[in-house]
Regions:
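Conserved active-site and cofactor/substrate-binding residues in soluble primary-metabolism enzymes
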Residues: 35, 39, 121, 125, ...
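Structural signal for hydrophobic packing residues in well-ordered secondary-structure cores
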Residues: 41-48, 131-134, 138, 223-226
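Short, intrinsically disordered C-terminal tails of secreted or membrane-associated proteins
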Residues: 260-264
């Protein structure tokens, strides 16, 4: 089954300051950091354009046979086991935050870092809001949903981004483009698959027990133990717990700002 591509616009979801701190590399909030986050949130206010485009497809489109690895990923195959349909989606918060990051990467690295963290939290919150809408909508239709699964998770290759863009027409639908090096612009964007399976196969409680968290971003299930953004229950050795000066050292060590020409306009 090929799908009509649907576009949805969202108001910015509620802000999770704890996630912003995590993406900044902070284990605790100091008055200095709190003031920085407040200032950056004020500057970013009204600049986000939260959009999602998606389509519902037969999972057979990706799994040609029992032995086939959909989009070249055995991990994705496991995630889609038992799923007769799959939702492919792309989400973005727009280009304006990229422009702020680019501007402050030269003027104030601390603000650039904070805007990076805000952008990461904003796009994840947008995806979570879309995930929840899909869960509710398809529960009423007799389906349960798997956690979302994105290119770059496990063995799911980034080259699969091309298939998302071909099927969803992302540039026209939500202004999202893909570079030759497989980077998305705007940079604070996500593509992912949500598997749908009949509610008769197992209870929702069992599904949640077998799967990562409902939004598909549970650090406990990820094999990348040295990830700089690993959640606090499994803290990485590299994340600082101090103030701005320590965070900036972490920023210089771990962060590379990759911006397209559009972000500098």
């Amino acid at each position: 089954m090929m799908s009509t591509v649907i576009t949805r616009k969202y108001d910015p979801p509620a802000i999770d300051r704890g996630e912003i701190l995590r993406y900044m590399g902070c284990r605790r909030q100091t008055p200095e950091i709190e003031a920085l986050i407040d200032s950056c949130l004020d500057e970013a206010n009204g600049r986000l354009s939260c959009k999602v485009c998606y389509g519902v497809f037969d999972t057979d489109l990706f799994c040609a046979g029992k032995e086939a690895a959909p989009m070249g990923s055995l991990d994705l195959k496991k995630n889609l086991t038992g799923c007769s349909r799959s939702i492919l989606f792309a989400a973005t918060i727009g280009i304006d935050l990229d422009r702020l990051i680019f501007r402050y990467s030269r003027l104030s690295p601390a603000r650039a870092l904070c805007f990076q963290a805000i952008g990461a939290e904003r796009i994840e919150s947008l995806c979570n809001a879309f995930n929840e809408d899909i869960r509710i909508e398809y529960k009423e239709k007799g389906f349960l949903s798997r956690p979302r699964f994105s290119p770059g998770y496990g063995d799911f290759p980034l080259s699969s981004q091309k298939q998302f863009f071909d099927l969803l027409d992302c540039p026209r639908k939500i202004g999202l483009s893909l570079t030759e090096s497989l980077l998305m612009s705007p940079s604070k964007s996500v593509t992912a698959i949500i598997g749908l399976y009949p509610d008769t196969s197992e209870t929702e409680e069992n599904c949640q027990r077998k799967s990562p968290d409902v939004h598909g971003n549970d650090c406990k299930t990820c094999s990348k133990l040295d990830c700089s953004f690993r959640k606090p229950d499994l803290p990485p050795e590299s994340i600082p717990s101090g103030g701005i000066s320590l965070i900036l050292r972490w920023w210089r060590r771990y962060t590379v700002i990759i911006l397209t020409p559009e972000a500098t306009s």
